Amino acid sequence: MSKRVILFLLTNLAITFVLGIVLNIIFQVTGIKGTSTTGILMMSLLFGFTGSLISLFMSKSMALRSVGAEVIQQPRNQAEQWLFNTVQRQSQKAGIPMPDIAIYHSADVNAFATGATKNNSLVAVSTGLLDNMTEDEAEAVVAHEIAHIANGDMVTMTLLQGVLNTFVIFLSRMISTAVSGSRDENGNSTQNTLVFWVVDIALQMIFGILATMIAMWFSRYREYRADMGSAQLVGKEKMIAALERLRHVHEPQEMQGSLSAFMINGIRSKELFMSHPPLEKRIEALRNL
């Protein structure tokens, strides 16, 4: 699984999980039993989108801290000047404001783009990529990241994740309310608080896994689109060459806690949880353009 979407998803899931617990506490303290479907849905929307929006607006600063990168204010050497010129040229061609640029020290052959909006975005590449790829290949990788920004992928992912969060919280609460509810000897509705909490938290974890599968499927779809965007900016042969290069380099190590927003490369795992399609499929899709 790639370093790019993982941090966003983990941050989002953590925030949503904590907010879900806070929601439980609010209901218990206020005495709300969760019987109002409309009320639960509104609260689920509020808490579901809060998690994804916080993740979105934190994405750029978190990405920079995670890799220890600093934004290039003024190119200091040939590599930085080349990257600056390449990003500037491609962003103009794609019709977006020029993103911030960063180079981070890592042996991984990788790059990522992140940021809350097209006006506040970041493109970062590793020293491993600059050391191991030709200029044509590196140019294609940068174009791939520019395509992610131009396509508005981070915002789209945020909206999708907000919807998924909402359903996770809503379904968990509705089911846990039904399972934990009963009637006393007088026919009054009662609720087993312990059962409610246990079932609600367990269901949020289960539904959260299913939501992650959906998010990963959408991420794979976006990778194909970004590859096509790169092909439009620099030509498909350069993008194919970049992907072929990735097949001959070591698989990148996972970062502590993962990272970021739009990595060009990804570590293979079971397909349902892969944020990127297999390189072979991406190359085949480009050749069929």
From Swiss-Prot:
GO terms for biological process: proteolysis. The chain crosses the membrane at residues 6-26, 38-58, 152-172, 194-214. It is a multi-pass membrane protein. Its main location: membrane. One of its GO terms (molecular function) is zinc ion binding. Its cofactor is Zn(2+). Keywords: Cell inner membrane, Cell membrane, Hydrolase, Membrane, Metal-binding, Metalloprotease, Protease, Transmembrane, Transmembrane helix, Zinc. GO terms for cellular component: plasma membrane. This is Protease HtpX. It comes from Haemophilus ducreyi (strain 35000HP / ATCC 700724). The gene is htpX.
